[in-house]
Every structure is written in structure tokens, then in C-alpha cells.
Amino acid sequence: SVGTSCIPGMAIPHNPLDSCRWYVSTRTCGVGPRLATQEMKARCCRQLEAIPAYCRCEAVRILMDGVVTPSGQHEGRLLQDLPGCPRQVQRAFAPKLVTEVECNLATIHGGPFCLSLLGAGE
């Protein structure tokens, strides 16, 4: 089923969206590597685009909060408290990665939004 395939190692790569980690921290707080923000955004969007539309919201959720795989491995939860950049601020932005202003990618909801993650950063 769709739900069971949206796990790391199946429709979602292991530790998905690692490029998005730095894009999110740079975009929300101006902290992170000294790469051009547009290049970081392009890398993040490419990683997100490579994930099937029906799993993109789950991949963003894993980036935000992590997951324990069926084999017991902890994956994701790449957003961490950074000096001057609290994790909650990054979590509030992460669901916006699929929106028109950011990567503009369709999801399981049929458009560029993750209904299941709205308000997740609050």
C-alpha cells in the first residue's frame, strides 16, 4: 500500500532530504554552509522531486521529526537546535518546501501542500 511504501529504503531514500536540512536553516535563520541559497534550494528541490508525490509529505515529516524503520533504525530528524536558530522555527518552515514559492511540487493531496503537516511547527 501507499502508506507502507513511504518508509526509508523503499519509496523514500534512507535519511531523506539531507540537502534540505541546510536550506531550511539558512532560509529560516541565515545559518549554515556558505553555499549560495539558490544552489541549496535547487539541491533540496531535486531531492524532494526524486521522491514519489505520494511520499513527499512523509519525507518532509521524517526530515522534521524522524522515524524508526521496521528494522529498528532511527532515521531523519535532521532539524536540530542551532545557535540562534531554534528547531521549532525550522520545523515551522519545513512543510513549506513543497509550496509554489519553494519547490512547487505536488503531493498526495494533489497540490503543492502537506495538509498533514499544517500547523506542525506551532
Curated annotation (Swiss-Prot):
Cross-referenced InterPro entries: Allergen/soft/tryp_amyl_inhib (IPR006106), Allergen/tryp_amyl_inhib_CS (IPR006105), Bifun_inhib/LTP/seed_sf (IPR036312), Bifunc_inhib/LTP/seed_store (IPR016140)
Main localization of the protein described in the UniProt heading: secreted
S-S pairs: 6-55, 20-44, 29-85, 45-103, 57-114
Pfam families, A to Z: Tryp_alpha_amyl (PF00234)
Keyword set, alphabetical order: Alpha-amylase inhibitor, Disulfide bond, Protease inhibitor, Secreted, Serine protease inhibitor
SUPFAM superfamilies: Bifunctional inhibitor/lipid-transfer protein/seed storage 2S albumin
A GO-annotated cellular component: extracellular region
Subcellular compartments: Secreted
Tissue specificity: Seeds.
GO molecular function, one term: alpha-amylase inhibitor activity
Family per similarity comment: Belongs to the protease inhibitor I6 (cereal trypsin/alpha-amylase inhibitor) family.
Function: May play a protective role against endo- and exogenous hydrolytic activities in the Ragi seeds.
PANTHER family tied to this protein: TRYPSIN/FACTOR XIIA INHIBITOR-RELATED, TRYPSIN_FACTOR XIIA INHIBITOR
Protein name (database record): Alpha-amylase/trypsin inhibitor
